[in-house]
């Protein structure tokens, strides 16, 4: 069953209007965006007696530039909350996505605040890659007149925790910037740290920037701000799972599911390139195993966010059980005085390796101890939703949303283990069962505003998902632009995801070219990056014709391998060295012609 949305919460723009608005504002500076914001306010309120929000006179007061560098939306939410805090304090603030920021103006910034996440192997979020490269290049200016603060979001289950924030913080200081505050590194449960940091930032900036009269306050926002919905990460839609179909062969080593979710009459809107956030329930069997290993019953009362719940319920719905971290291992070892785990304490590399290879339940099984229920809860991290690239376009499927789910399953000493969200969707939600979802908008992975622009799509494995959405959208609009797909997986007969659909697009002319890489169908392993090199001359022709390049999939290896291949193609066929090719690719990124959705 779905919960209907109030009409006032529906998105006021259709996808076409949204695309035109994004195209029109792509090249504007923060100051120009501020003027446009005031202009539209004036259009809407021509005779109102209220004071319009207009830019402060240049030179009268230093503005605060607030840069949001977000991958999954958390950094953006923190930045937007800080913007609201600064406005409430009557401070002059400009909020801008890192991807929209004209980074060559950074030398003129007086007060700079960056909120950033980290992705992959310690890399900046996609929208901040160009800014990061610029600051670490020889072109970076001195920032002796800039005062700055950095808030960094990360995940301690990854080795390079908060590395992007550390990079920005150290480089800004190295370039001569003055720290307003020490950098804060926040884990998955970031809300309390963010709230405290925001209050400190406001206090510090009050002493550095004169308080503005309401008529002087400037508030500009990222393009993300135009998305409105009553359904959010904290208030998800109760939707219905309508289709769960395995789309890999019976002999495939992979279990990949095509999932369709009915949004009903909720009015929830999304665009190709967006992600679907899915809240999930931990496997009750896993909860039972963990509870029994600790000689508990599951009915013990525990406190979660100020509420009292039975232990089993808290573990099923509120805490992460399928991803271990070095901090959890270290804290469990210290708490239980485990003889097998204590030698790992203080050794970061060993802790990381153990956490990556040993799920929480098996850590407990291998190092049995007796914990009370609240001690167990205090050891764990809060459950967070999983994000899946959307594999459909509403222009075709209307009130549905489709995702492509690779089911995580493996074995630990004969015991079956599985990913929390993927096994929930694949095995524990029945058709017509309830799934709590929300849309995570991603304006950094969008089709070209001009429908005649050629598109190159590189998506091995489940990375093919957003390109199914891209093709549905382009087919529904009847666009004339050329489309080229690079896809790879182990075997043609077992792992060609959405094979019939791609063959239909080729037959009907919607898909101009398709190059397939099957890594296990021959002695020599072939991957999508090999196909890119093989088609280098034609690929360069497409790029010269203005093609937009999109990459989706694994951030740890594939994305880097694909980027290396692209650089080699650009260097060879563009007649330049690798350093120049890297600058060329960076320019494509700035122009939104090279976009990645990697995880």
From Swiss-Prot:
One example of a Gene Ontology biological process annotation: hydrogen sulfide biosynthetic process
Cofactor details (free text): Binds 1 FAD per subunit. Binds 1 FMN per subunit.
Cofactor(s) this protein cannot do without: FAD; FMN
Residues binding NADP(+), per UniProt: 519-520, 525-529, 561
UniProt-listed SUPFAM superfamilies: Ferredoxin reductase-like, C-terminal NADP-linked domain (SSF52343), Flavoproteins (SSF52218), Riboflavin synthase domain-like (SSF63380)
Subunit structure: Alpha(8)-beta(8). The alpha component is a flavoprotein, the beta component is a hemoprotein.
Gene Ontology CC terms, in alphabetical order: cytosol
Ligase among keywords: no
Annotated FMN binding sites: 70-75, 117-120, 153-162
Residue ranges of every copy of the FAD-binding FR-type domain listed in the record: 234-448
Gene: cysJ
Organism of this sequence: Salmonella paratyphi B (strain ATCC BAA-1250 / SPB7)
EC number: 1.8.1.2
Annotated protein name in UniProt: Sulfite reductase [NADPH] flavoprotein alpha-component
């Amino acid at each position: 069953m779905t919960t209907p949305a109030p009409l006032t919460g529906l998105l006021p723009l259709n996808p076409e209007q949204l695309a035109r608005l994004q195209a029109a504002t792509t090249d504007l500076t923060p100051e120009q965006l501020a003027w446009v914001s005031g202009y539209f306010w004036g259009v809407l309120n021509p005779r109102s007696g209220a004071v319009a929000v207009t830019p402060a006179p240049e030179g009268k007061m230093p503005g605060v530039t607030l840069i949001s560098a977000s991958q999954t939306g958390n950094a953006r939410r923190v930045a937007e909350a800080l913007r609201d805090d600064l406005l409430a304090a009557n401070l002059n603030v400009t909020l801008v996505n890192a991807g929209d920021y004209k980074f060559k103006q950074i030398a003129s910034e007086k007060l700079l605040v960056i909120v950033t996440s980290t992705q992959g192997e310690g890399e900046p979020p996609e929208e901040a890659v160009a800014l990061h490269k610029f600051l670490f290049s020889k072109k970076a200016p001195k920032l002796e007149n800039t005062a700055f603060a950095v808030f960094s979001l990360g995940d301690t289950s990854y080795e390079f925790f908060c590395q992007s924030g550390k990079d920005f913080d150290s480089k800004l200081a190295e370039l001569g910037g003055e720290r307003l505050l020490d950098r804060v590194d926040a884990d998955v449960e970031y809300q309390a740290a963010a709230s405290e940091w925001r209050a400190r930032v406001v206090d510090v900036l009050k002493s550095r920037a004169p308080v503005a009269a309401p008529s002087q306050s400037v508030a500009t926002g990222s393009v993300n701000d135009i998305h409105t919905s009553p359904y959010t990460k904290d208030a998800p839609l109760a939707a219905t799972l309508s289709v769960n179909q395995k789309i890999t062969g019976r002999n495939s080593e992979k279990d990949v599911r095509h999932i369709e979710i009915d949004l009903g009459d909720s009015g929830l809107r999304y665009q190709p390139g967006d992600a679907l956030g899915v809240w999930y329930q931990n496997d009750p069997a896993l909860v039972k195993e963990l509870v029994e290993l600790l000689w508990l019953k599951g009915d013990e009362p525990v406190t979660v966010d100020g509420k009292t719940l039975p232990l089993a319920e808290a573990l099923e719905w509120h805490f992460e059980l399928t991803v271990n971290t070095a901090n959890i291992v270290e804290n469990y070892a210290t708490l239980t005085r485990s003889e097998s785990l204590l030698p790992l304490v203080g050794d970061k590399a060993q802790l990381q390796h153990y956490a990556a290879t040993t799920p929480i339940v098996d850590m407990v099984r291998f190092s049995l101890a007796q914990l009370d229920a609240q001690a167990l809860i205090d050891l764990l991290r809060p459950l967070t939703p999983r994000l899946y690239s959307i594999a459909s376009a509403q222009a075709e499927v209307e009130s549905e949303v489709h995702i492509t789910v690779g089911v995580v399953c493996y074995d630990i000493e004969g015991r079956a283990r599985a990913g929390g969200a993927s096994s929930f969707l694949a095995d524990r939600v029945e058709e017509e069962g309830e799934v709590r979802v929300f849309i995570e908008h991603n304006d950094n992975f969008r089709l070209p505003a001009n429908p005649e622009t050629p598109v190159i799509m590189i998506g091995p494995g489940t990375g093919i998902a957003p390109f199914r959405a891209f093709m549905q959208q382009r087919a529904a609009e009847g666009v004339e632009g050329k489309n080229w797909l690079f896809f790879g997986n182990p075997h043609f007969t077992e792992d060609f995801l959405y094979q019939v659909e791609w063959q239909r697009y080729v037959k009907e002319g919607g898909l101009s070219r398709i190059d397939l890489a099957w890594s296990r169908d021959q002695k020599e392993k072939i991957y999508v990056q090999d196909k890119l090199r093989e088609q280098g001359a034609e690929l360069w022709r497409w790029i010269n014709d203005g093609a937009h390049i999109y990459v989706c999939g694994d951030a740890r290896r594939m994305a880097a391998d694909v980027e290396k291949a692209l650089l080699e193609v650009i260097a060879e066929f563009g007649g330049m060295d690798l350093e120049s090719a890297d600058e060329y690719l960076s320019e494509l990124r700035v122009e939104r012609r090279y976009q990645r959705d990697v995880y």
